[in-house]
Amino acid sequence: MDSDGDDYVMSGSDQEYDDEEREILEDLRKQRKKPHDPVQEVLGFSDDDDDDDDDDEEEQQDVAELMRDSDIEGAEDDDRDLPNTMDWGSKRSTYYNTDFVDQDYSSYNAQEEEQARAEEEEAKKIQLRLAKRMSEADFQLDNVEAAPAGSSDDNELSHITKVTSDLAGLSERERRQLMHSESPEFIILTQDFQQHLDEVKNLLKPVLNYVRKHDVPMVPALQYAGLCHTVLTTYCSNVAFYLLLKARRIDVKAHPVIRRLVQLKDLIEELKPRYEEYIRPQLEALLERIEDGDAFTVLDVAQRKAKLQILNKYNDGQQASVSSDDDDNDDDDDAESKEKDLQEEAGEEEEEEDARRGITYQMAKNKGLTPHRKKELRNPRVKHRGKYRKALIRRKGAVRTVRKELQRYGGELSGIKAGVTKSVKFRT
């Protein structure tokens, strides 16, 4: 057999194989016969000479296939029983259950550690072999071509984002029709822009500036006006951005500004009824007074009319009493007590005005037509306590109670006096 294999001619002789090749061929035949013929042949013979020729051809094919087999490094090597490092193997279970995760560390033994180390070394060998196969051509970008400057995508994008600029040959009517077809919202937005801008400029802004400048308390009406001012200015700024995009002839159908304008438009429609009915008339009246130069203050809405009337009456009476006698301290005390009483009455009246009328005792108890009972019998605890007290009184009449000694005689504390007699005489 030639090393190149180009001048190889098949022959029917067994002399071409050496002992090592015959052993390999015999092993290969046994492996092929095992799955197909479980019964081993003891004395096999052939009746025809043609079978020998067929066997020779089969041997040649087996040797050629054996030489190409990935499990054999080469016929001239001594390590014929070692598998090739490039061989994938024939067992699928080899490629499963080889990785370890966190929960597998508890059952990690020395054998598995050795297998993991061998797997790591094999991976490093494969990585090194792949790195050796790479050349400088693998790191070049020869097969990646740059897109041309005037690509079709850019042309399509320019057609999408820009409107046709050839309007010189169109009439005024055709221009209006083109504008209505391409941007029907343009006229509505421009009208809203002018209307809201005038509202902010002529009414909302002057009033709010005066309020902030003179530290006027922000009552709910002014807070609502400030909210309307913020919403309208935001809407006008978005409309201005929309007009800027239209001036640059950029298509705004898919632009986020359209969605934002719709949201602000809905919010303005929600605020408009209350603003037109309540807030705007008050702002107009307030603006007239500001322009006239009238000085005004915002009253405390928490004050009640009844309380103001009572305090005014008391102040008038107090001024009269103070003017008559300023040095009388008793009158001052009486005035303070009267003021306190009047304030309490005003507080009660204020509570009565705010709260509902309370229910009566009969409504709360809801007894109906229950029979009258003594007060002592209403509470069982009080009832049994009274019975016990009466039983003690009856027992004292039948059985004498035991009287314990209060204090024993401990001798005279200051000595014995001859003229003092404290003994008890026995009467006969």
Curated annotation (Swiss-Prot):
<comment type="similarity">
    <text>Belongs to the SAS10 family.</text>
</comment>
<feature type="region of interest" description="Disordered">
    <location>
        <begin position="317"/>
        <end position="386"/>
    </location>
</feature>
<dbReference type="GO" id="GO:0005730">
    <property type="term" value="C:nucleolus"/>
</dbReference>
<comment type="function">
    <text>Essential for gene silencing: has a role in the structure of silenced chromatin. May be involved in gene regulation during development. Binds RNA.</text>
</comment>
<feature type="modified residue" description="Phosphoserine">
    <location>
        <position position="323"/>
    </location>
</feature>
<feature type="compositionally biased region" description="Acidic residues">
    <location>
        <begin position="46"/>
        <end position="62"/>
    </location>
</feature>
<dbReference type="Pfam" id="PF04000">
    <property type="entry name" value="Sas10_Utp3"/>
</dbReference>
<feature type="compositionally biased region" description="Acidic residues">
    <location>
        <begin position="15"/>
        <end position="24"/>
    </location>
</feature>
<dbReference type="GO" id="GO:0032040">
    <property type="term" value="C:small-subunit processome"/>
</dbReference>
<feature type="region of interest" description="Disordered">
    <location>
        <begin position="1"/>
        <end position="93"/>
    </location>
</feature>
<feature type="modified residue" description="Phosphoserine">
    <location>
        <position position="324"/>
    </location>
</feature>
<feature type="compositionally biased region" description="Acidic residues">
    <location>
        <begin position="344"/>
        <end position="353"/>
    </location>
</feature>
<dbReference type="GO" id="GO:0003723">
    <property type="term" value="F:RNA binding"/>
</dbReference>
<feature type="compositionally biased region" description="Basic residues">
    <location>
        <begin position="370"/>
        <end position="386"/>
    </location>
</feature>
<dbReference type="InterPro" id="IPR007146">
    <property type="entry name" value="Sas10/Utp3/C1D"/>
</dbReference>
<keyword id="KW-0597">Phosphoprotein</keyword>
<keyword id="KW-0217">Developmental protein</keyword>
<keyword id="KW-0539">Nucleus</keyword>
<keyword id="KW-0694">RNA-binding</keyword>
<feature type="compositionally biased region" description="Acidic residues">
    <location>
        <begin position="324"/>
        <end position="336"/>
    </location>
</feature>
<feature type="modified residue" description="Phosphoserine">
    <location>
        <position position="337"/>
    </location>
</feature>
<dbReference type="Pfam" id="PF09368">
    <property type="entry name" value="Sas10"/>
</dbReference>
<feature type="modified residue" description="Phosphoserine">
    <location>
        <position position="152"/>
    </location>
</feature>
<dbReference type="GO" id="GO:0000462">
    <property type="term" value="P:maturation of SSU-rRNA from tricistronic rRNA transcript (SSU-rRNA, 5.8S rRNA, LSU-rRNA)"/>
</dbReference>
<protein>
    <recommendedName>
        <fullName>Something about silencing protein 10</fullName>
    </recommendedName>
</protein>
<dbReference type="InterPro" id="IPR018972">
    <property type="entry name" value="Sas10_C_dom"/>
</dbReference>
<keyword id="KW-0156">Chromatin regulator</keyword>
<dbReference type="GO" id="GO:0006325">
    <property type="term" value="P:chromatin organization"/>
</dbReference>
